[in-house]
């Protein structure tokens, strides 16, 4: 579980080349977002505690795009609801990704296998799948992790124990220590994404 070396200037350059957009207009990666991205990439395991409005899906997007150039396997993004599967797909498209080509969506009844490099799924759709299914991933994001059932989350993360990059994101840790410890066991230490510099 060694930390990764990170070339900050290379990463800045990489983000510039993504030509990020929102609603068709160019946007910048803000400093606090950049800091969170660096933290996650160096640690390889983190829970990013990011308040509403801090551009959490943009942080996920940049980390995912960067790691796609570094890792040999796919990226799995797990969300609590079907509507969030759709939202993540649309957000990534909005930021400039060809989601149709790059993203496979899994929710009730959807095909579980794909050649696409990014898989977005509800946890309900995959927690009963065999360990072998999780072996195709190098990176796992749990988005809105406070909304996962602890038991199902542990089942997923146990099966994904070989996956080197593991990130959880949430706007809130509900103060239940047990759940928080479960999350940290699955994803690593909490990093507070502060929007005030």
Identify the function of each model-found stretch.
Residues 7-49:
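Conserved pre-motif I regulatory segment
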Residues 43-67:
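Walker A/P-loop
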Residues 73-81:
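Conserved RecA-like ASCE P-loop NTPase motor core of nucleic-acid helicases/translocases
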Residues 82-84, 111, 125-127, 146-147, ...:
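Conserved nucleotide-binding/hydrolysis micro-motifs of P-loop NTPases
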Residues 82-107:
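Conserved helix-turn-beta segment of the N-terminal RecA-like "Helicase ATP-binding" lobe
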Residues 108-139, 150-155:
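Conserved helix/coil segment N-terminal to the catalytic DExD/H
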């Amino acid at each position: 579980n060694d930390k990764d070396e990170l070339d900050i200037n290379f990463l800045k350059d990489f983000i510039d080349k993504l030509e990020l957009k929102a609603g068709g207009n160019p946007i910048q990666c803000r400093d606090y977002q950049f800091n969170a991205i660096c933290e996650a990439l160096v640690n390889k395991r983190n829970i990013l505690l990011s308040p509403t409005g801090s551009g959490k899906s943009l942080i996920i997007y940049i980390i995912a795009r960067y790691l796609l150039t570094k890792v040999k396997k796919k990226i799995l993004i797990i969300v609590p609801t079907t509507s969030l599967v759709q939202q993540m797909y649309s957000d990534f498209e909005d930021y400039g990704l060809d989601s149709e080509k790059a993203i496979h969506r899994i929710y009730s009844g959807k095909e579980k296998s794909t050649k696409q490099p990014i898989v977005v799924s509800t946890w309900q759709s995959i927690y009963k799948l065999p360990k072998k299914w999780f072996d195709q991933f190098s990176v796992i994001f749990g988005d809105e992790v406070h909304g996962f059932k602890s038991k199902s989350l542990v089942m997923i993360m146990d099966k994904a124990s070989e996956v080197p990059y593991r990130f959880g994101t949430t706007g809130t840790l509900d103060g239940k220590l047990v759940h928080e410890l479960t999350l940290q066991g699955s994803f690593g230490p909490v990093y507070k994404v502060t929007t005030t510099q």
